[in-house]
Amino acid sequence: KTNLQSPISGTIESISDVTGQIVIREKPLPVEVDAYVSGRVSDIIKDEGVTVESDAAYVQGIFGIGGEARGDLEIVSGSRDSELTIEDIKESHSGKIIVGGSFIGIDAYKRALELKVRGVVVGGFNYYDLEEVLGYRLGVAITGTENLETSLVVTEGYGNIKMSERTYNLLK
């Protein structure tokens, strides 16, 4: 018999009957996951996560690119049928999620990228500008994994379409 001391603490994962190799799994590191909402943990789901009770609303867009973002929400357009322009996007919007009205053009979106705005929510966007933003033509696809500084959520569709009154008022 030979006694060996493991250089690490852990749990024996497996022992090979052929080679005698012992695989030891180190203690798992806890993973912290942001909830993106404030609230109260009402249930713990073993090995999966938690349920958070919160006063919240769910706004679903028609289309989005850039994944999840967080920041203070600021209404920038004066109405739900106003276009979000370059002039509307200020340095003070850096790190924020801004809400426009009916549309954001490619130049205004580039301004938001340049200023590191975290997200833009508008009624519409030009489909043909997506290729310039992404660097490739987007077909039918699951979106949200694009590596973009500024996420874009389009609530109504392609083109200049005023944001629904209900959505705009909720965000306002």
Enumerate the language-model features and the residues they cover.
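Well-ordered secondary-structure scaffolds
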Residues: 1-172
